[in-house]
């Protein structure tokens, strides 16, 4: 094949990448946000170099909210936040802000669907009618053992 899309965790994506690279050094590897964690690089090593990944936050962002989250997260967990940490932070902020914006008798769901965007680590988060968040997608590639956001 010319390319392979891995919709797996970081651990499985790293293992698959190693097996694939044993057989084909040239195939393009793509992975979902689920694999976009430091574990991918730790476990995958050279096999994940050049892998292209989807992400909903820019690891290189200079946004003040993301900088604050990074500081607190690193102090507590001794590592940078990944997609799950940022998503949990944004979800919590959205719910707390929606509760503050809610008027007496108003359903939280309705507030979250109609009163966004809500502040997040990088930018505001709003929700569609199904409750899915609307975010700016980012594409990253693994280069020299780091996720680099493509511009």
Briefly describe each language-model feature range.
Residues 1-151:
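Extracytosolic ligand-binding ectodomains
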């Amino acid at each position: 094949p010319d390319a392979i899309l891995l919709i797996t965790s970081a651990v499985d994506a790293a293992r698959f990448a190693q097996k694939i690279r044993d057989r084909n050094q040239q195939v393009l590897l793509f992975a979902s946000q689920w694999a976009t964690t430091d574990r991918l690089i730790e476990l995958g090593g050279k096999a994940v170099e050049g892998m292209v990944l989807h992400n909903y936050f820019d690891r290189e962002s200079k946004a003040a909210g993301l900088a604050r989250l990074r500081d607190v997260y690193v102090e507590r967990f001794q590592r940078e936040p990944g997609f799950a940490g940022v998503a949990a932070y944004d979800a919590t902020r959205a719910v707390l802000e929606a509760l503050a914006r809610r008027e007496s008798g108003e359903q939280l769901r309705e507030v979250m669907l109609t009163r966004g965007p809500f502040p997040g680590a990088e930018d505001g988060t709003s929700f569609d009618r199904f409750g899915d968040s609307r975010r700016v997608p980012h594409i990253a590639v693994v280069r020299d053992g780091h996720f680099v956001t493509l511009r």
